[in-house]
Amino acid sequence: AMVTTSKGTLIAAADQRNTHWSDWGNIDTVVRRSTDNGLTWEEPIDVIDLKSQSYFNGTQSAYTIDPALIAEGENGKNPGRVWMLVDMMPESTNGSQGTYSIKETGTGYVKVDGKDYLALYDKDNNQYTLRENGEVFDKENRKTDYVVKQFEGNDKQGYHEKGDLYQSGKYVGNIYLRSASKNNDSAPLHPKQTCYLWLSYSDDDGMTWSEPVDITP
């Protein structure tokens, strides 16, 4: 994807496949900027770089793929803002065959008191919901001691820790990782194994990007 901003900067967004050409695995969403109409390009900027398992061998990674860009004009609601829409997959092999292929249906969200919340599940398939400020509630609508990491301001590391789960302040894994081999970094709670739609934006011509927001429901 490529757009020209209201200031004349070219921004190109792409999948950075770090290990192989397939549509799964360790894939980051990156952008490059040009301020001279494409004659030269700056170094890639990581927008989203989700976690992989320590035993990654081609598939054991959460990832984002297929970014789309829209640039607002100076007379837009958010003058000069650049929006990015991207598909997000928890640890999986996309729609391909295999144990961790994307095969669950639905949005991955449930309604609580009229609001949509991301559903999380434990190993016994008990349902939880991810609420405001990263708080996690159980099926009986009781707040638990689980909290998902929140970010303040823009993160220059591609939101690598997005999805990190803490229990009583202790890190217990990442909700977007799921496989259970030795030394895994999977959290005890995880969302449905389906595709999600994330939205991010930049207000400085693509130099920094907001924390992606899941707009799936």
Where are these regions (language model features)?
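Asp-box/BNR beta-propeller blade signature and adjacent active/binding-site loops
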Residues: 1-217
